[in-house]
């Protein structure tokens, strides 16, 4: 069963939104903007951001918004504008180099220390080099070979969950999170005895209780990963980290020490958030649409791949792409974002844009491929998620196995959109 659908050419919408370089009468380039509070747009934004995004999109594709701490960001909404922003060379992910010019933040993110030399924090050509070396080993063949192990892990975790005497559990704690953590640890060759510590670091960095706690967790993880790299260099295994240590391109280029441990750190953190959110949001979408759940239960073998793609489109695992900083003035959707502007790209809204997806607020696991293809759940352009095939594989196995083994599974109580838990009963 393929992890991805074949690509098809994309033609930008010709509806009411202006093209990426066009000025509009309402918002000509250079016009000052007053920052808006998303909670003023919709007080329920934290629980369900989609109505606020839709209101903003109806006014235009780029908006200056303010955060709870007084931060100011340029928020990009709508499919065409988001694709443009994701591929704009004027919007940088290299905070090490361009962070000092950022405006609207109390301070730029601290990215100078060890563990930050990964491709998510680099622009081409540095990013191109790092991704090329990583892609030599993190291949679709390696990911496909993981499916039997992912299936065994899923079954073992479900065995433990279904043994609960009160027939209740949280799917995130019982299944989604331990599955993802175990898969990443096995992929990197991390010994069983070290995984509890790894879980603590991952929890704190992916969902920090404070900026200081996240930095402290990274500071603890980096020496461990450095030692792991040294051990794998001395005694290679058949894991991904060992392969990355020894891979080189045609010119003899290799990842250096900091790049190796940074790559391991990226796999831990980026994969944690996207996959766990994907599984939890996907299950919640199914339970919120009993007709679609019934369809999938009746024919999971045929429908599960399309259902996974619809889950990704309908409620993106990560609502906004990692922030970028404008290294030069850039026009997107008729609005000039000034040099130093910090830009958030609303992936979740892009995939609910009626200019690209018919009836986008309808959850339809039988949506025709042409009507779901091209979603931005995993980003777009050079920073498109390298781990997307693995996330799709895990989602497909988990959803299919849940439906097969837990025919009476149901949500255990009401959940808001922002709730990361998925309490269930059976």
Protein language model features and the residues they cover:
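Cytochrome P450
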Residues: 1-426
């Amino acid at each position: 069963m393929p992890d991805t659908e074949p690509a098809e050419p994309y033609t930008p919408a010709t509806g009411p939104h202006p093209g990426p370089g066009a000025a509009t009468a309402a918002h000509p380039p250079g016009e000052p903007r007053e920052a808006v509070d998303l909670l003023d747009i919709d007080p329920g934004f934290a629980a369900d951001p989609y109505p606020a995004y839709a209101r903003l999109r109806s006014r235009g594709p780029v908006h200056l918004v303010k955060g709870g701490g007084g931060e100011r960001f340029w928020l990009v909404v709508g499919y065409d504008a988001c694709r443009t922003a994701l591929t704009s060379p004027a919007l940088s992910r290299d905070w090490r180099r361009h962070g000092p010019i950022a405006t609207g933040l109390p301070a730029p993110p601290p990215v100078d220390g060890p563990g930050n030399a990964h491709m998510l924090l680099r622009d081409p050509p540095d990013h191109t080099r790092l991704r090329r070396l990583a892609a030599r080993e993190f291949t679709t063949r390696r990911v496909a070979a993981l499916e039997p192990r992912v299936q065994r892990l899923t079954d073992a975790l479900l065995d433990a969950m279904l043994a609960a005497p009160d027939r209740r559990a949280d799917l995130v704690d019982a299944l989604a999170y331990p599955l993802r953590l175990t898969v990443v640890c096995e992929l990197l060759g991390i010994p069983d005895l070290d995984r509890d510590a790894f879980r603590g670091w991952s929890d704190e960095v992916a969902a920090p209780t404070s900026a200081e706690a996240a930095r402290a967790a990274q500071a603890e993880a980096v020496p461990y990963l450095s030692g792991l790299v040294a051990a794998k260099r001395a005694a290679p295994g058949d894991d991904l980290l060992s392969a990355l240590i020894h891979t080189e391109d045609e010119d003899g280029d290799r990842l250096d020490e900091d790049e190796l441990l940074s790559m391991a750190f990226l796999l831990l953190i980026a994969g944690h958030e996207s996959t766990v959110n994907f599984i939890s949001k996907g299950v919640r979408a199914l339970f919120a649409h009993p007709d679609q759940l019934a369809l999938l239960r009746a024919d999971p073998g045929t429908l599960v791949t399309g259902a996974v793609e619809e889950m990704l489109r309908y409620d993106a695992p990560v609502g906004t792409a990692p922030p970028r900083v404008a290294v030069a003035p850039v026009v997107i959707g008729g609005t000039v974002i000034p040099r130093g502007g910090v830009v958030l790209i609303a992936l979740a809204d892009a995939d609910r844009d009626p200019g690209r997806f018919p009836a986008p607020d309808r959850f339809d696991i039988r949506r025709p491929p042409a009507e779901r293809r091209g979603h931005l759940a995993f980003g777009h352009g050079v920073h498109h998620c390298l781990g997307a095939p693995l996330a799709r594989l895990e989602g497909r196995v988990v959803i299919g196995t849940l439906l097969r083994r837990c025919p009476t599974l149901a949500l255990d109580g009401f959940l808001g959109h922002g709730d990361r838990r998925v309490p269930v009963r059976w």
